[in-house]
Amino acid sequence: MNNILFVALGGSIGAVFRYLLSIFMLQLFGSAFPFGTLLVNVIGSFLMGTIYALGQVSQVSPEIKALVGVGLLGALTTFSTFSNETLLLIQSGAWIKAFFNIALNLCLCIFMVYLGQQLVFSRI
C-alpha cells in the first residue's frame, strides 16, 4: 500500500511539472511545433536513464522507484520508459527487436491517435 501512495505522489508532481513545462514552451515558441511534448519526453528519458543507472550501481529503494520511476515519470511521460526499454534491447544486441519496438510504438501510437480522433469526429 505504501508504494501506491508514492506512485500517487510522484504522479501528481509529474503531471504538474508536465503542464508547467508545456505552458512555458508554448509561450516561448508558440504552437508551430510541439516543443513542450518534446521537452518533457527528453527530460523524462534522461531521468529514466538516471534512475535506471542508479539502480544498477547502488541500492535504490522500492519507494524511490515507485515515486520517481512509475509516478513522476509515468505522469510526465511514458516515452521515458519506451526509450529505456529500446536502449536495453540495443545494449543487449537485440537490434531487430529494438527496431520493431521503435517502429511499432511510433506507427501504432500515431494510428491510435488518428483512430481516436476519427471515433470522436464521426460522432459529432
Swiss-Prot record:
Family (UniProt): Belongs to the fluoride channel Fluc/FEX (TC 1.A.43) family.
Ligand binding (Na(+)): 74, 77
Molecular function (Gene Ontology), one example: metal ion binding
NCBIfam families: crcB
Organism whose genome encodes this protein: Shewanella sediminis (strain HAW-EB3)
Reactions the enzyme catalyzes: fluoride(in) = fluoride(out)
Keywords of this entry: Cell inner membrane, Cell membrane, Ion channel, Ion transport, Membrane, Metal-binding, Sodium, Transmembrane, Transmembrane helix, Transport
Activity regulation statement: Na(+) is not transported, but it plays an essential structural role and its presence is essential for fluoride channel function.
Chief subcellular location: membrane
Keyword Cell inner membrane among UniProt keywords: yes
Membrane-topology descriptor: Multi-pass membrane protein
GO cellular component: plasma membrane
Superkingdom classification of source: Bacteria
Record localization: Cell inner membrane
BP terms from Gene Ontology: cellular detoxification of fluoride
The protein's role, per its UniProt record: Fluoride-specific ion channel. Important for reducing fluoride concentration in the cell, thus reducing its toxicity.
Name of the featured protein: Fluoride-specific ion channel FluC
Disulfide bonds: none
